[in-house]
Amino acid sequence: MQLTPRSVHLVHLLLAATTLISPSWSNHQSQQPALQALSPDDTLFAHLRCFELFASGQQSRDRDADAADWLGGNRERYLHRVERTPAFVKCVLGRMHFYDSSERRFNVNILRTQYNAYKQWMTLSEEDVDDFIHEVSNIGALNSSNDAEVYDALKLLFTNHSVSFFQLFLRDPTVLQNMYDDKSLSVRKPNQTVVQFCELQMAAELWDDICLIRAYQISNHTEAMERHIACIFRGFQYLDANSSIDVKEIVRDYELTETLDEASKNSIEECARNASEKDDIPKRSLAMYSCLLDGSHSEVFKKAFDFREVRSGNLTFLVQNLPYDRDQVRQQILALDKEHCNDQQPLAGRFIED
């Protein structure tokens, strides 16, 4: 499908935001605290996933408008109300842990957590944050957690605190640019996939095995391989906020490639149970990855994994709601392979003909 000029602009806008993702925690090996700060990757993913769930389903101007309003980083347009907006807003607030539907309350703790983690890149003062927290606290419990009531509550907060909201949840372009300019942070570049980013972070001893790894083989440099796969799983959101295997997220990628059936779903669940016995996050990640590559369902996993890699560096798929095209994905994956591997290097097993 041809993109409209407006759609092309939106894709470029979104990819600019993607350059600012910094999963610097991707190799952490310890369990994370119960309420950890959200990274730019986390808050962007919350918006992208809720966009997928609630934007206009058609490849149309309505979908373009939803992308511009919800993903464009414009405070004045963010809460522009159409029938889909309240559901999107509640979805985002829940995924960012700012609203608890079961308690019917906003969570002020996440505001302080975000500020403490990222204040060096923000223009907010302690007083700004305290005022925001005070006003959020004064709201108390809502009468219900229906979409409209949550939306109305956030809109009221936006009257005085839209700048604070955008900065604390890392959707403000200035804050993101400040983070991008800080050379001490690792950031993902425009059109760079999660796998490409993680390849640049991986240990030197893995580089001799890069073609084998891209062909879904496991390097003998076990600890480095564990950290590499953990980085990818973080970026793909295959690990949840507690660093547990997110079965639903993996299942979803199988659904998008139309390869999910009862047997493959059972295989994913069994692999997750076994991998979860590993206390160490990198070991858990590699155990899950290895299990999914083992047995009769390995090829469907590769299809899902390849599509996830391509989509992570090309938001056209999301903005335009484009379906899975096996030949197109294969061509893009082979192009990525050739960045590291020539025709003489080992890529055997990369693809099995359908």
UniProtKB/Swiss-Prot annotation:
Residues 1-26 form the signal peptide. It is found in: Secreted. It comes from the Eukaryota. GO terms for cellular component: extracellular region. One of its GO terms (biological process) is vasodilation. Pfam families: PBP_GOBP. Keywords: Hemostasis impairing toxin, Platelet aggregation inhibiting toxin, Secreted, Signal, Toxin, Vasoactive, Vasodilator. One of its GO terms (molecular function) is toxin activity. Belongs to the PBP/GOBP family. Modulates blood feeding of female mosquitoes on vertebrate species by binding and sequestering different mediators involved in the host response. Binds serotonin with high affinity. Binds weakly noradrenaline and histamine. Does not bind tryptamine, octopamine, dopamine, adrenaline, leukotriene C4, leukotriene D4, leukotriene B4, ADP and U-46619, a stable analog of thromboxane A2. Inhibits agonist-induced platelet aggregation. Exhibits vasodilating activity. This is Long form salivary protein D7L3.
